[in-house]
Amino acid sequence: MKPDRDSLDEFFEYEAEDFLVYLALLITEGRTPEHSVKGRTEGPHCPPAQLSQPAPNKHECSDKLAQCREARKTRSEVAFLWRNNIPIMVEVMLLPDCCYSDEGANTDGNDLNDPALKQDALLLERWTLEPVPRQSGDRFIEEKTLLLAVRSFVFFSQLSAWLSVSHGAVPRNILYRVSAADEELKLNFSHSPTEHVFPVPNVSHNVALKVSVQSLPRQSSYPVLNCSIHSNLGFYEKKILPREHSVTQPHNSQDNDQNSAPVSQHAFTKPSWSVGPEGLLHARTNVSTDLSLPVRNSKLLSTVDKGYSIGTPPSKHQCFSMTGNYKAAPQEPVRNFKSFSLVGVPCSPQASQTVETNPLIGSLIQERQEVIARIAQHLLQCDQTSSQINSHSIINELSSINGKIKNSSEDEKFQKKNKESPPICTSTLALTLSTGNQISNLKKAPDTPINSSRPILEFHTSPNPQARRKLILFESNEHFCNPFQSSGQSTVPSSNNENINKLPEKRDIKQSEHGEISTRTGNQLSNSCNTNDRLCTNTQIVPEDKSCTDSFHKPQKDNPKICSQKVGHRNGQAQETTCRETRKSDHSNQLLSIENCINKDRDNIQYKEPQDKLKSVHDENEDPTNCDCLAQGQRKCNGNCLQRSESLKNTEQKPIQLRHSCTWKKQTFRSLDGISTKAFHPRTGLPLLSSPVPQRKTQSGYFDLDNSLLKLKGLSTQRQHVNGFTDEDTVATNKQLSSSAPPAPCLSLLGNFEESVLNYRFEPLGVVEGFTAEVGASGIFCPTHMTLPVKVSFYSVSDDNAPSPYMGNITLESLGKRGYRIPPSGTIQVTLFNPNKTVVKMFVVKYDLRDMPANHQTFLRQRTFSVPVRRETKGAVTENGLKAEDRTLRYLIHLRFQSSKSGKIYLHRDVRLLFSRKSMEVDSGAAYELKSYIETPTNPQYSPRC
């Protein structure tokens, strides 16, 4: 009956539903791209490699994180399918980088109904998780073994190889889809896939799990994916030429080139935009565009009510049309538009003319109208880190493409209309781009999209205080004009550049890696709107009437105000300005207490220091020690702050003591760093820790104590009441003690050094930190290996302070109340590492506890001796015939076992070791070998648990 019980209870450490979720999350998050040498990492929701080991930093999900939302969605989908006994399918696919966003790794399953997405996606893997009836007979593998196999497959997959080679740059748009496996397949492999079937584990008493994966064959190079929009560019070139096609041609003059907007209300109510392979912004309409300058990091969101229509000619003015209220703040000079909204409103009625489209082209555009509008919401620009391209090559490539479109779309009738009625531009926004010295000065803008529907501009600032630069604040009820904007003018006034350059030297505005307005305007456009731009270092946006004090300059048109102090609210009534004074000594210890004092004295500081006293404005790059804000408040609390920091510092320096059965003296329980004389030999001065284990010439061979130890002056007085270890004294001691007597304040030493140390009867001379041990077991199942810290101590046991073996203690309390679960019979392996991560000893212990009753306990001790080799009598000498004085104890391991009520076997409480710090197998000059002996209690072998 016991094997049946083991087969039913032994291997199911996880619930079946949780195990399915682990597998799904490992597939979807096991290859999260990151910019590193490895190129990928496991997401925070992936199961750890060692589930039994406590995680150092446990992840807490937040609804604000997209990855957490996707993980929660995956959990719910997998749980729903599993509860309904439906096979689960996970598809891994790639999308082109040009027309799909790289922010979201997952998308709704409904989007796969889109014919354009079906055509654009490249299917890499198709995983199938199918519940099957429980396997009969011998078990195949455990759930954890399957988890490791899936992790290994994910690690060595084609997708991981691409990420590793590119250091996380490509692929960027990875799509995961969780669905029912019995649904109709919406995507097919481009080549015949290879299939791998994993071993089938049992996940419950009557259900097993079959996991299989179909993957695309390995490819030597990364495939270049083109979306359906860009791949049909040649189709338009071939079809437009033989057909009659009327399009409004922009009027070319010697001064500037102006491109009109799309004019077909029916076919272009939602214009399509595309980003080329080099990251260029194109208007995918049938008008001729002249784009010759890269626009980096462009994400375009398509809306119908509000937005922009954007074009970027090389060095001329470009007309824009927009509807509704607009608010945008470019975070660096040109080419870094992060988010704009597109509408299909033409520039002016005069420029709008009906277009006679070809029926074939018109039907194709009408069919893809909704598809293009949805894809346009996720348009993005290739990242600067992925490709660095030359502007001259971009100009040449675009000019050739635009030339083809112009030649194919022009006819005689079209040219006549251009001569008779030139287009009239009525836009209110003009941009000029300078390709000279500004290219090298541009830096990457933050990835925060700026939507025209947002009332307040949002910025993502770096956690590094030095990277927090000046932000642009504006009122939500007024228009915000950027430095690249002009009010209904096609030329740029030069007076605006002078206004910006007239800023004081102390208020110099610098660029940062998170994007900001450069004062080196040169040939750039400047702001011509009548708005008051305020540049501040705070991360809170405060209305203008509450953010500046009377001491600042009065508001003037086209005069930015610069404030380098943090502005905030308290109880919605008033603001406070705080500046923390940097101290050179004990800054880290006093920081917390100083902030607490400042928080307590906020009210006094606000009323005692009015706002009109803030007469000087500091630059954020100046030395913070020059800031004299809150000087009075800090003088008041500095005394208390120093006292509190000292008390806090003292509480953090409490020593950590080992847990044992007797109380050790604080005078003798010291760390290795605090030992002066006892760590070295008093006569020779040599280090005692590196000496070999002393050989005791005694009858027992168990590191017996010498009687001369009792006369030492260096030992503590608590050990002086113990007399010689004779049989008479031992009997007399046993007679004095009874089971009803209370325990002595300090327990006496036991019969030999081994027992005294293992039972914590010795006071340690010091402790050594940094030892670790890897604990594992094998048998009918293999539990997860664990790496645990080892508390190591050493002792003084001889008259010349010769070193003793080290005592190591591995606490299993972190694994739970029961301990470390092991098979009923098998092998336990404990690998000990020193602080240098070098193996000191590998203990391998065989055991058999299959006959151990439930709710019982026992122990096992393995001793390893160095035994001389006698070649002349090899094979004739038995273990019993070996004399005790011929062997020396080298290593020892003490294990404790207990059984639960259901009969499961656990290693519990701790594992105790005796060893030498150095890996000393045998002496080089002697013929010795190591032999191990295992001892267990015999009468009784098992005892009931308390």
From Swiss-Prot:
SMART domains: DUF4210. Residues 749-806 are annotated as: Required for macropage invasion. The gene is atosa. The lineage of its organism: Eukaryota, Metazoa, Chordata, Craniata, Vertebrata. Its main location: nucleus. It comes from Xenopus tropicalis (Western clawed frog). It is found in: Nucleus. The protein contains 2 transactivation domains (TAD). Each of these domains may be required for transcriptional activation of a subset of target genes. Keywords: Nucleus. This is Atos homolog protein A.
